[in-house]
């Protein structure tokens, strides 16, 4: 409570002003998930992985697979760190279960 001086004037002692401070937030860093070409993984399996784990249409998955085949690497998508890390693990796990040497990595965008 504010204290009052004689004469009814408020000298401001004991009063406070509450201001709302909005926290400064940053957007999370994004990471590209990459599939690497190899000579052993069937092209159809790469298309399956892109459809299954990255929700790509058959057409987009085929286009990305051909890019990987011709250029050695291709971007599957861009995600936050945790999502990218999970997708990399899912792809590698699926490749191992199907006995393919397919490699998947992530890098900061």
Swiss-Prot record:
InterPro entries: ClpS (IPR022935), ClpS_core (IPR003769), Ribosomal_bL12_C/ClpS-like (IPR014719). Residues 1-21 are annotated as: Disordered. Pfam families: ClpS. GO terms for biological process: protein catabolic process; proteolysis. Binds to the N-terminal domain of the chaperone ClpA. Involved in the modulation of the specificity of the ClpAP-mediated ATP-dependent protein degradation. Belongs to the ClpS family. PANTHER family: ATP-DEPENDENT CLP PROTEASE ADAPTER PROTEIN CLPS (PTHR33473:SF19), ATP-DEPENDENT CLP PROTEASE ADAPTER PROTEIN CLPS1, CHLOROPLASTIC (PTHR33473). This is ATP-dependent Clp protease adapter protein ClpS. It comes from Caulobacter sp. (strain K31).
């Amino acid at each position: 409570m504010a204290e009052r001086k004689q004469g009814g004037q408020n000298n401001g002692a004991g009063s406070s002003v509450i201001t709302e401070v909005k926290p400064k937030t940053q957007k999370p860093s994004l990471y590209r998930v990459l599939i690497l070409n190899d000579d052993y993984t069937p092209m159809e399996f790469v298309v399956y992985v892109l459809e299954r784990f990255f929700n790509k249409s058959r057409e987009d998955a085929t286009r990305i697979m051909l890019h990987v085949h011709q250029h050695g690497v291709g971007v599957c998508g861009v995600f936050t760190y945790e999502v990218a890390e999970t997708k990399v693990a899912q792809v590698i796990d699926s490749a191992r279960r199907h006995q393919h040497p397919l490699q998947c990595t992530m890098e900061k965008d």
